[in-house]
């Protein structure tokens, strides 16, 4: 049926498609390391677009890949539908503390300028890339996400924006990430 999707990739994508509790296909289900990097995103997008009816994300790792994702979505949905609806989104992380890099700004430009959505998820380990206190880490995450939101709205007012966060802490003794600590339940409320 399609040369680029075989073996475990096909199996994983089939499982994602068949589970009714999974409402989204994501983007990188399984990294196809046997495909050249400059073409990998095209194969993954084609698989999502032809083998599943679930929404999915697009590529963000380079401006051309983000643009390819938006262009492929336009081929599938048409310009009129795409102008009126968000049909694909990109998911980016800020580089804490308080840095929005080239990858984020270029992906935001590719998606938002065409009215497509961006999911922005600051990744902060309290005590390493952010303040030790829970409240200060949340404030930093909000500031980082709002920087990207403001940029997106400058590019195209009203462009869709989803704010997420990935906040955790680290042991100040060992430096190891400490997932599952009680502070995190307060952060994700």
Q: Where are these predicted regions, by residue range?
A:
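Glycine-rich anion/phosphate-binding loop at the beta-strand->alpha-helix junction
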Residues: 91-187
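Single conserved hydrophobic/aromatic residue that forms the stacking wall/gate
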Residues: 1-7, 12, 187-188
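Residue-level signal for functionally critical sites in structured catalytic/ligand-binding pockets
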Residues: 1, 5, 48, 144, ...
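Catalytic alpha/beta active-site cores
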Residues: 8-9, 13-131, 135
């Amino acid at each position: 049926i399609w040369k680029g999707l075989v073996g475990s990739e096909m199996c994983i994508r089939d499982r994602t498609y068949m589970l009714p509790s999974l409402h989204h296909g994501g983007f990188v289900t399984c990294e196809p390391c046997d495909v050249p990097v400059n073409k990998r995103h095209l194969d993954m997008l084609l698989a999502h677009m032809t083998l599943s009816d679930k929404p999915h994300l697009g590529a963000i790792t380079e401006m051309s890949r983000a643009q390819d994702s938006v262009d492929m979505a336009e081929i599938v949905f048409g310009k009129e539908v795409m102008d009126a609806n968000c049909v694909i989104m990109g998911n980016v992380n800020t580089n804490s503390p308080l840095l929005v890099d080239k990858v984020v700004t270029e992906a935001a430009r590719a998606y938002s300028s065409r009215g497509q959505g961006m999911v922005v998820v600051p990744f902060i380990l309290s005590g390493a890339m952010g303040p030790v206190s829970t409240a200060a880490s949340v404030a930093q995450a909000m500031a980082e996400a709002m920087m990207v939101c403001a940029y997106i709205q400058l590019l195209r007012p009203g462009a869709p924006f989803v704010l997420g966060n990935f906040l955790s802490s680290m042991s100040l003794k060992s430096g190891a990430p400490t997932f599952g600590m009680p502070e995190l339940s307060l952060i994700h409320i």
